Amino acid sequence: MLAGGIKNKIMKYYKGINDAEYGFQAQVDFGDEKLLKKDIYKEVEFSFIDSINYVKTKVKTDVLDIGSLSFHGLLVSEKFYSICERFDSHQVQFVDIIGDENLKGYKFMFFNGDLTTKIDYRKTNFILCENMLDEFEVLNENLEPSRKNMINIDKEICSVDIFKQLIPKNGFSFIEGFDINKYNIFRIGHFDEHFYFSEKVVKALKAENITGITFVESVNFSPFTHC
């Protein structure tokens, strides 16, 4: 807390999203069960990945769209990695890609963190919305304020209907003693699977003309009503 009891301001965060214009630029061998069935919230125990291959007909960018693995993280170039390494992150793990000379220097950037335990559910006003082409309709704004309930709603409703979303109407509030500002790269988890980058990281990446990724400012860290 700052003097006078004013709450620390949360800095701007951006969602990192693969550029759709390039299509799938890399693929995983179907036989690699340990990779394809990885627990999203656990670190991998292997030090390299040899089952990812570059699609030679595609444009090579700093961040490559890998389709089936995109849920776990990002396939990034050495330049992208070296920039991110300068900033504090929450349970982000980089693993070397080997075997394909076209991917020399690339790493897979796993987002293993779960910050849903750090959210203050009574202060965070979660609502269930339907988002059809950015036209929001509130379906339920009287949700039981608990982590268990939010995860269940995400699993039973949102995961089976891509247009339904759980949204923190006035932005995330976090439990006392936890400061989200100390992390520049992270994922919330469960009902929010986006990959978040702070404004400082985004500026550093853009200064180096990083390609293959789009950054969209997230309203989930804003105190203003957005649904």
Which residues fall in each region the model found?
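Phosphate/anion-contacting hairpin/loop surfaces
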Residues: L2-L74, E78-C227
